[in-house]
């Protein structure tokens, strides 16, 4: 089985920044990977296209995926509002790791974050389900629009997304 690859075309205040592609670890966390894949294609009638990265902290991570409220309080999974932590086999080993944001145990929806550093304190709390395959330089460029409290100086959006 080949792990799926999805892409995000990132824009800054409506201007194209570039493409980031992700390998989704369907071999280790199939349910979590399938949620992200389907939200990237929009095949269920909802998903990431047009949503923003509402929280970017340089030297830590870029967080997005709230396509219902756009502020970090919303989002939903393809399985209903929330789903369980599938497993914690994969670790937050460094830049480029793709992991689920949550509000405590078994509260995965659609929010995710891309690590820009090793974040081992998140191991066992957040489900790692993918990695940046290409376009880490775009993620690094996104960091410049973040701040210590996570507020972004410009609107960073997923202008387009899908499966490769």
Swiss-Prot record:
Cited InterPro entries: Cyclophilin-like_dom_sf, Cyclophilin-type_PPIase, Cyclophilin-type_PPIase_CS, Cyclophilin-type_PPIase_dom
Keyword tags: Acetylation, Apoptosis, Cytoplasm, Glycoprotein, Isomerase, Isopeptide bond, Nucleus, Phosphoprotein, Rotamase, Secreted, Ubl conjugation
UniProt note on regulation of activity: Binds cyclosporin A (CsA). CsA mediates some of its effects via an inhibitory action on PPIase.
One GO cellular component, as annotated: nucleus
Post-translational modification remark: Acetylation at Lys-125 markedly inhibits catalysis of cis to trans isomerization. PPIA acetylation also antagonizes the immunosuppressive effects of cyclosporine by inhibiting the sequential steps of cyclosporine binding and calcineurin inhibition. Acetylation at Lys-125 favors the interaction with TARDBP.
Ranges of residues in domain PPIase cyclophilin-type: 7-163
Residues with PTM N-acetylmethionine: 1
Cross-link Glycyl lysine isopeptide (Lys-Gly) (interchain with G-Cter in SUMO2): where in chain: 28, 82
GO molecular function terms attached to this record: cyclosporin A binding; heparan sulfate binding; integrin binding; peptidyl-prolyl cis-trans isomerase activity
Record-linked SUPFAM superfamilies: Cyclophilin-like
A biological-process GO annotation: positive regulation of NF-kappaB transcription factor activity
Sequence positions bearing N6-acetyllysine: 28, 44, 76, 82, 125, 133
Recorded catalytic activity of this chain's protein: [protein]-peptidylproline (omega=180) = [protein]-peptidylproline (omega=0)
Top-level taxon of origin: Eukaryota
Residue numbers of Phosphothreonine PTMs: 93
Residue positions where N-acetylvaline is found in the record: 2
Subcellular location: Cytoplasm; Secreted; Nucleus
Major subcellular location class: cytoplasm
Modified residues (Phosphoserine): 77
Glycan-carrying positions: 108
Protein family per UniProt: Belongs to the cyclophilin-type PPIase family. PPIase A subfamily.
Name by which UniProt lists this protein: Peptidyl-prolyl cis-trans isomerase A
Annotated organism of origin: Oryctolagus cuniculus
Lineage per the UniProt record: Eukaryota, Metazoa, Chordata, Craniata, Vertebrata
């Amino acid at each position: 089985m080949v792990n799926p690859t999805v892409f995000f075309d990132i824009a800054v205040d409506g201007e194209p920044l570039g493409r980031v592609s992700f390998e989704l670890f369907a071999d280790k966390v199939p349910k979590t990977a399938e949620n992200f894949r389907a939200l990237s294609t929009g095949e269920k009638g909802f998903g990431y296209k047009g949503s923003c990265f509402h929280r970017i902290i340089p030297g830590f991570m870029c967080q997005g995926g709230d396509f219902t409220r756009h502020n970090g309080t919303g989002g939903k999974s393809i399985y209903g509002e929330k789903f369980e932590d599938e497993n914690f086999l994969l670790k937050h080993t460094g830049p480029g790791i793709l992991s689920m944001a949550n509000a405590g145990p078994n509260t995965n929806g659609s929010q995710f974050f891309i690590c820009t550093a090793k974040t081992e304190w998140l191991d066992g709390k957040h489900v790692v389900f993918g990695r940046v395959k290409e376009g880490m330089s775009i993620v690094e460029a996104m960091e410049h629009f973040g701040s210590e409290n996570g507020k972004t100086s410009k609107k960073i959006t997923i202008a387009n997304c899908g499966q490769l």
